[in-house]
Amino acid sequence: MKITTLGRGSIGGTLARLWTKAGHEVTMFGRDGGDASDADVVLVAVPSGVVPDALTRVTGLDGKVVLDATNRMTATPPAGYPSIAEYLKAQTGGPTAKVFNLNFGALLEQAAQTSPKPGNIWVGDEAARAAVEKLTRDIGMEPLHGGSLELASVQEAFAVMLMGIVGDRDEGLLYYRFASPQTF
């Protein structure tokens, strides 16, 4: 799969390395942008407050599968949109998913060696499912579909709560897993 990541930081950079290792062709853009025309999938992993500006610097986004890994810890979605993911869909017109925003970049590289497999909650368009599930499994995680893109604002809010859980624990960062009892 040809993937463009918009963002080279903890999430974007780590996923790019893992996907390259899994055999995907990955191009990384910083906030300066570039041309994503050749991409099958575009990962948006920049700070939420710069999403609108960053998008103006990327061409070739029309109709692409867009994976939104942003979190709006302090920023609000662009005016008129309940979530950043829905804003991204409106700008690109392609299948969109809110995904990889509930994971910690520092732990992503360890996911493949973790048992049971950590979960990766996502919401989004059905047309994005194949890409989301393949790219999630390719890094050693289990995709957990939570519903349609209209739930992206709920997932964004959950990210804030997850940061509270992490901040309240002495152990630091964490994986999460939802599974039937017989899988543990």
Predicted region positions:
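Hydrophobic Val/Ile/Leu positions in short beta-strands of Rossmann-like dinucleotide-binding domains
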Residues: 3-5, 44, 122
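Rossmann-fold NAD(P)-dependent oxidoreductase module
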Residues: 14, 18, 91, 135
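Rossmann-like NAD(P)-binding element
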Residues: 33-65, 69-72
